[in-house]
Amino acid sequence: MGNPKSNQQPFVPQHIGTKPREAGGNKGKQMQDQSGQHPQVIQTKGE
């Protein structure tokens, strides 16, 4: 038996991937692929 609360809400996971990324402190919205193009990868070190 748990500790029942008066106003229980259904469990909604807050994990990464369940919500669309929005612009905040990081540039999630800005860095998202919006136009269907491939991201421009800048090679910084030799592979």
Curated annotation (Swiss-Prot):
The parts of the chain that form a coiled coil are none
In which compartments does the protein localize?
Spore core
Name what induces it. Expressed only in the forespore compartment of sporulating cells.
Regions of compositional bias (Polar residues) in chain numbering: 1-11, 29-47
Give the record's GO CC terms.
endospore-forming forespore
Q: Which UniProt keywords apply?
A: Sporulation
Ranges where the record places region Disordered: 1-47
Q: Which Pfam families match?
A: SspN (PF08177)
Please give the superkingdom of this protein's source: Bacteria
Say which family it is in: Belongs to the SspN family.
Q: What is this protein called?
A: Small, acid-soluble spore protein N
Q: Which organism is it from?
A: Anoxybacillus flavithermus (strain DSM 21510 / WK1)
